[in-house]
Amino acid sequence: MPKPLHALLVLALGGACLSSPAFADDADRPLLLTFCDAANIKESACTKAKGYPDAGNRACDVKLTADRYSGRFVASGNPLLVVNYESGCEAHATNDGGAVMFEQSGGKAICRGFAPGSRVNDCVVLKGEPQDQLACLTGHMGQGILESGVAQMVFTEGYNKDIGIATDMLLTAEDSNGAFGANVVTCKEGPKNFELSDIKAGPRPETVMVKAGYADAETIKKACAKGFPKPKQTFGKLTRGDAYVPEGYEKRSTFIIDLVTRKVTPQG
């Protein structure tokens, strides 16, 4: 189930938030107080978040996690702290949670909105002018297929000061070991990425590096000519025109991704 390389998925944000007491990097309570009554706070969780998007009559819980990134992600605004959260109001399809944005201003935090489904796991902040950039690894498992990618998180400010996020996919990968027992390529298609990991700042401004396991044209040609041994254990039946690439027979390299030109090149 390959996806277009350059996909832009806009995630709507909702809910107004209140300003908080003094901001503290080492404590979640001041952050939680921006959208939660004190009586509803327990450790890093709020049992009833105010202004949660599409909550209706539900009492939506929000539990802040350790994944968080700070930077000036809106050129005209103050620095933002972007924090992952878990919520029982979100399903597997929306990653069981999302991210919440806090504006850092005058030693205080102001909640600027929730982004259900938009998690900031394994990210890197690229400092720059007029604003910083946030690039993240993404991942979603469905029916044994692990889809991953490298995405640039694009922040926008609405008329009501809420912050919106758009996830701009720069590179995608598909690992089908869980569905077929091995990775799979389509013989009439081009190179395919299987996995992406270990994102870091790149060697030049506005670039990132990521480790990749992939099949190039040579690998696909050999797989389709049955030049690889059969995987030890397979599941289901391949579609006509597909072929296995057993574990250990994929190519490995580090890719450099330019966030401006969107060009992807192997390192070296």
Language-model features, listed with the residues they occupy:
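Bacterial N-terminal signal peptides that target proteins for export
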Residues: 1-9
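Bacterial N-terminal signal peptides
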Residues: 8-17
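Sec/Tat signal peptide C-region and signal peptidase I cleavage site
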Residues: 18-24
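Acidic, small-residue rich beta-repeat scaffolds with periodic aromatic anchors
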Residues: 24-50, 142-268
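Short N-terminal edge-element motif at the start of the domain
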Residues: 55-129
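Acidic/hydrophobic-patterned starts of short beta strands in beta-sheet-rich repeat architectures
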Residues: 72-86, 127-140, 152, 198, ...
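Short, flexible beta-strand-to-coil junctions
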Residues: 84-93, 103-106, 138-142, 209-222
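Long, charged/polar, surface-exposed segments that mediate recognition or autoinhibition
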Residues: 95-99, 107-109, 125-127, 131-138, ...
